[in-house]
Curated annotation (Swiss-Prot):
Cofactor binding, per record: Binds a second Mg(2+) ion via substrate during catalysis.
GO biological process, one term: glycolytic process
Metabolic or biological pathway: Carbohydrate degradation; glycolysis; pyruvate from D-glyceraldehyde 3-phosphate: step 4/5
Disulphides: none
Organism, as annotated: Lysinibacillus sphaericus (strain C3-41)
EC number: 4.2.1.11
Subcellular location: Cytoplasm; Secreted; Cell surface
Record GO terms (molecular function): magnesium ion binding; phosphopyruvate hydratase activity
One Pfam family recorded for the sequence: Enolase_C
Major location (coarse): cytoplasm
Protein name: Enolase
Family: Belongs to the enolase family.
Length: 430
């Protein structure tokens, strides 16, 4: 039987050189699972707590030895010899109860999630099936449309661009493999476009370019130029997406949005006007966190104005939390949720959020964090849930490409049953 014999955690490094938690789960059958927990740069204030040591003499206070110790003592004592790795929901529930706090602040969401994911990997190993098939069953066959962050600003880059992410979505591709090729070709052409204009071509946290530009709108125009230079049609084969990360722009003192790169200050209503103008002018199909996470009136207004034709994704707004999402659904706020496993802390709660979104006609976009690793679990989650969309950076840097390569493998494994729905993945739009 696949009963857990050992749960072991260690401190490893993420893609930004910061410590994170790696967990290994061993079973009496010999089945084994390993996972590495991701970490965010711009975080919502309602996210589950990522436990950091705070010891400034180690890793500038970002060590995770407390979280590691919690896995190797409290969690290990609870799980070893008592649970089968096939009991994912039971184990996740036990971990939540063991922590006992609303935000997983006692043991740390990074400790709990590491165990939750490693257990799933061990179960798939025991059953000798791919992780996506174990998590989703025989009907897991939809490859996601990639939301590829090719130009970075905000908290993800040291430049004057206020908007955190500008992305391309190859909605007109015939397969995931084709979509990835389109994205990569646009990425390389963007480098050439930026170089021709005398802009920097260094990359940010998520692999996208991070130049200083004349305005936020110029980021859109250089990407459109790169799409055409690569031989594709903007608006037909390729749509644009933005993650504004507005909570990073919001000033609590005056209640306004400060776009420091442009030297502009906007009210909530002016931000909505701006998005309406941009989406009328350019082929933008998705906007994430267009307003501050606590500006629900602004989000509601944005949804009323453009929500029928533009995907409005809640990241900091919903933080992968079913209570937050339920409130959004009830109030008509947004039409999509960003799914980040470490915002909530267990696979069970992650899947509950995805199911709730789908039942309400909201899309669920599976997402990485800016601090990633070689762990590609989210690629399997995207296919397991037939989510239809994944956001995991540029086709650059191994920590991002690891997810894309895993999706290529999955598409190969699925063979003729694999589906890539492109624009049909946006079932939330009219």
């Amino acid at each position: 039987m696949p009963f857990i014999t050992q749960v072991y955690a260690r401190e490893v490094l993420d893609s930004r050189g910061n410590p994170t938690v790696e967990v290994e789960v061993f079973t009496e059958s010999g089945a084994f699972g390993r996972s590495i927990v991701p970490s965010g740069a711009s975080t919502g204030e309602y996210e589950a707590v990522e436990l950091r040591d705070g010891d400034k003499s180690r890793y500038l206070g970002k060590g995770v030895l407390k979280a590691v110790e919690n896995v190797n003592t409290i969690i290990a004592q609870e799980l070893e010899g008592n649970y089968s790795v096939l009991d994912q929901v039971v184990i996740d529930k036990a971990l939540i109860e063991l922590d006992g706090t609303e935000n997983k602040g006692k043991l740390g969401a990074n400790a709990i999630l590491g165990v939750s994911m490693a257990v799933a990997h061990a179960a798939a190993d025991y059953l000798d099936v791919p992780l996506y098939q174990y998590l989703g069953g025989f009907n897991s066959k939809q490859l996601p449309v990639p939301m590829m962050n090719i130009l970075n600003g905000g908290a993800h880059a040291d430049n004057n661009v206020d908007i955190q992410e500008f992305m391309v979505m190859p909605v007109g591709a015939e397969s995931f493999r084709h979509a990835l090729r389109i994205g990569a070709e646009i990425f390389h052409n963007l480098k050439a476009v930026l170089k021709d204009k005398g802009y920097n071509t260094a990359v940010g946290d998520e692999g996208g370019f991070a130049p200083n530009l004349g305005s936020n709108e110029e980021a859109i125009t250089v990407i459109l130029e790169a799409i055409e230079k690569a031989g594709y049609k903007p608006g037909e084969e390729v749509k644009l997406a933005m993650d504004v990360a507005s909570s990073e722009l919001f000033n609590k003192e005056d209640g306004k949005y400060h776009l420091d790169g442009e030297g502009v200050v906007k009210t909530s209503e002016e931000m909505v006007d701006w998005y309406e103008e941009l989406t009328n002018k350019y082929p933008i199909i998705s906007i994430e966190d267009g307003l501050d996470e606590n500006d629900w009136a602004g989000h509601k207004l944005l949804t009323e104005r453009i929500g029928s034709r533009v995907q409005l994704v809640g990241d900091d707004l919903f933080v992968t939390n079913t209570k937050k999402l339920a409130a959004g659904i009830e109030q008509g706020v947004g039409n999509s949720i960003l799914i980040k496993v470490n915002q909530i802390g267990t696979l069970t709660e992650t899947f509950e959020a995805i199911e709730m979104a789908k039942r309400a006609g909201y899309t669920a976009v599976i997402s990485h964090r800016s601090g990633e690793s070689e762990d590609a679990t989210i690629a399997d989650i995207a296919v397991a849930t037939n989510a239809g969309q994944i956001k995991t950076g540029a086709p650059s840097r191994t920590d991002r490409v690891a997810k894309y390569n895993q999706l290529l493998r999955i598409e190969d494994q699925l063979g003729s049953t694999a589906e890539y729905l492109g624009l049909k993945s946006f079932y939330n739009l009219k």
